Amino acid sequence: NDTPKSVLLGTWKITKKVENGEIKELYSDCDANETFVFQEKEAINESYQKGKFNPYDNKLECRSQKEVYPTYEYKKEENKLYLETEVNGKPLMISQKITLENNNTQLTIYHNYYAEKTYRVYTKQK
């Protein structure tokens, strides 16, 4: 059952973040916990924003931000991932360039406008 969508099913954890050609450090407390979860119908991207530093346990507070896409589609021949989002109350499919490598265990999602220089790499979780 190797439909284009089936290769994405599961949980992907961020392993690399590049902005404008510069590799950004993944601060273990927050950034490194970002995941992209692909289910049968929906896709969920959960990232964490750095919050305040907590002096009591010497940790950064991480605020979870969840984006839920009710549907998604992967067009392998185009290397595009289509995510359904809502704009002004209407559903809209946005596309992002993606690549799958290393036997479909490494997923790179490119930022639309700075595709070559801004992207995130996720690794499939067992």
PLM segments and residue spans:
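Short, exposed beta-strand-loop hairpins at the edges of beta-sheets
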Residues: 106-116
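A generic structural motif
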Residues: 15, 84-86, 110-112
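N-terminal helix-cap/turn-to-beta initiation motif at the start of protein domains
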Residues: 1-13
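Short, low-complexity, Pro/Ser/Thr/Gly-rich segments in the mature regions of secreted, periplasmic
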Residues: 116-126
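Functionally engaged cysteine thiol sites
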Residues: 26-32, 61-64, 113-114
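Short, solvent-exposed loop/hinge segments that bridge or flank secondary-structure elements
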Residues: 13-42
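Residues that flank catalytic or metal-binding motifs in active/ligand-binding sites
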Residues: 8-10, 31-34, 39-40, 68-70, ...
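Contiguous, well-ordered beta-strand patches that form the walls/edges
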Residues: 41-104
